[in-house]
Amino acid sequence: DSPAAATLKGDPRMATLLHRAVWSHVGTADEPLVVPRGAHRWRVAAYLVQEVLDELAGRGVRYGAARAMLPQRLAHLVLLGMERAGGSPDDRVQDAVARSSAVQRYAAQLWPPVEPRAMLAGLLSDGDLLARHAGDLFAPEEQQILLWDKPPRSRGSARWSAADAVLLDELADLLERTPSLGHVVLDEAQDLSPMHLRAVGRRCSTGSATVLGDIAQGTTPWATSSWTESLTHLGKPEAHVEVLDRGFRVPAEVIGYAARLLPHMAPGLGIPRSVRDNPGELVVQRCAATE
């Protein structure tokens, strides 16, 4: 990736883009569900199926979890029809209907599986597909930067960058929830992008975290500019921030000289202090631009 592409891939807008792309796969119920069972053909109106689709999509569960629920929800609608016809179906009948080829095929058409690598490869190689989901998020010139210069011959042959790996992780979590650890320790946090931080945050969504870093020393173009921003993307906006502004390694005279850059590099950060004072150790020497 170029620095510009990596920066855009680390932008939090990518989370919205990927969410849209995944959930766009959910179809619309235009045809009724028809389930043959014995001598009967049980019919569920399309509008009832659509209500189930809307309810599952609005539950806030992962795409894959909702997809797994759909056959049982459809089978339940079939059972309601059986009961209205005077039958007394039980849970075993519902399970059998949910496993039937008619329900499985119908559910797969409305809620197809999504594979993260295929999804991302499509977005990065198809300008029309990218624009469909990114049109109001990324400017046309930004979309052009995101697109691969030379799309792979097949999606299986795609070569993923480090920035792509984080997007694949985001996609995987949209499909199935990432398990949370009890505690995560993160060092050098100042160099991470918002999407990096989201990936770490998923690993401690129900746990805790210790995050270390110096915002003023961020070395990447995609780095965040404040602890407030970093912790928000990490999913811990209310976390306690302990400022460690005393050090021994660098003499006070050097710190004082370097701190002149703070207002430009990290506005709002306080000046660090050194417990070691060595007057006269810092010598500033003017030199030519070519030296």
Q: Would you name each region that the model predicts?
A:
Residues 1-6, 169-183, 190-291:
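Conserved helicase motor core of SF1/SF2 NTP-dependent helicases
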Residues 2-33:
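P-loop NTPase motor core
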Residues 4-12, 60, 64, 93, ...:
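Hydrophobic alpha-helical scaffolding
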Residues 14, 70, 163, 167, ...:
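Phosphate/oxyanion-binding active-site loops and adjacent basic polyanion-contact surfaces
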Residues 17, 106, 257-260:
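Generic recognition of well-ordered alpha-helical segments
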Residues 28-183, 192-197:
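Conserved helicase NTPase catalytic core signature
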